[in-house]
Amino acid sequence: MVIGHFPRVERIAEHAQLTVLERNCRDEWDTPDPACEYVIPEADYVFMTGVTLINKTATRLLRLAQEAQAHTVMVGPSAVMAPALFARGVEAIAGSIVADPEATRFAVKSGAGKLFGSALQMCVLEAPDAHTTRKRTAGEA
């Protein structure tokens, strides 16, 4: 389960059953986001963009993922590296941090689309108990 249509998300479909919850559907994997209450309970893994924090859907989506006992990861440049998300069921945050403030400032001012490399560095912050295995038994939602 992916919440938010990431670039190259279709590559996940090569390895797993893919459902993408998306506000602006644009291809065969996309499902309108109001369907979240029907599809998240069936998910083993939920990857959601940090945009869910911005558009105020994160609280509801994280609650559904917790109820489903799904492994949940907040991803993307908009993912806030905030350990407080761990209390909401997020197991890892895969985002970015500013590595070079001047290069970042220049890239933002000039409208550069690619900031990774010298300006931003990708990183992963894991919850202290992130490797705890969650198992569902037959019949559990």
Per-region residue spans from a language model:
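Adenosine-cofactor binding site in Rossmann-like domains, unifying the SAM/SAH pocket
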Residues: R23-E37
